[in-house]
Amino acid sequence: MAALVPDETTDDADTAVAAAVDMLAQAGVKAHGEVRNTIFGYAAREIINDAGEVGAGVIVMGSRGRGDLAGLLLGSTAHKVIHLSHRPVLIVR
């Protein structure tokens, strides 16, 4: 499986993650945010593997992706991460 991610999407993601990390720091929460592009592989498995590599205490991700039918209430990638991960998963809108 392969996906192409437009540069604008990556830039927007970097900006959003930096803002979230700043807000958490202001609240006294130690956080690390990182945007990674998965070109080959399955997104859910890559997210779980990346979380393991960095020793994440929790995986935070959006509730919906770009697919309209894949997940009516919860995006299919988020759904898979919730069910496959042994780490806590926080879903945000």
Where are these regions (language model features)?
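Acidic, proline/glycine-rich short linear motifs
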Residues: M1-A18, E46
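Short, hinge-like loop/turn segments at secondary-structure boundaries
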Residues: V5-D7, D50-G52, T77-A78
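Structural beta-alpha unit
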Residues: D22-I59
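Glycine-rich, Arg-bearing micro-motifs that act as flexible, cationic patches
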Residues: V58-K80
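Intrinsically disordered or low-complexity boundary/linker segments at protein termini
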Residues: L84-R93
